[in-house]
Amino acid sequence: MNLKQALIDNDSIRLGLEANNWKEAVKVAVDPLIESGAILPEYYDAIIESTEEYGPYYILMPGMAMPHARPEAGVQSDAFSLITLQNLVVFSDGKEVSVLLALAATSSKIHTSVAIPQIIALFELEDSIARLQACQTKEDVLAMIEESKDSPYLEGLDLES
């Protein structure tokens, strides 16, 4: 699963969206994947239920969340969406987020061995959250992903398959 290609294939980069709370933020993050057929609507419900039970375990760094649920919760194909919000939303643990990268993985192996390294590579770029917030076009986001491809986290990964 290639982050850049998955975002292109699913037309799932959305910038400057509005959300009044964390549930709306998760909804606008997964909507592009529902629209593309990568996930079923119940995937959203599974994320909400899991968040309410375990807290927002998918906030990976200040300002950024990677909402996801288990593969059997409605994943049809491997996919990502990346959205930015106009305003910060506060999650149940008090953490604020303005960038969400939703992940749909058909297996836990893809999640840990392929998806996570690409996400780390992107978000380890200097000022990644501010830079993503400043992106005006999908092409701006894709250029940042391209910039991240030299990350040591991606060494040895076959991102073309």
Predicted ranges, named:
Residues 1-161:
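Cytosolic covalent-transfer regions centered on His/Cys nucleophiles
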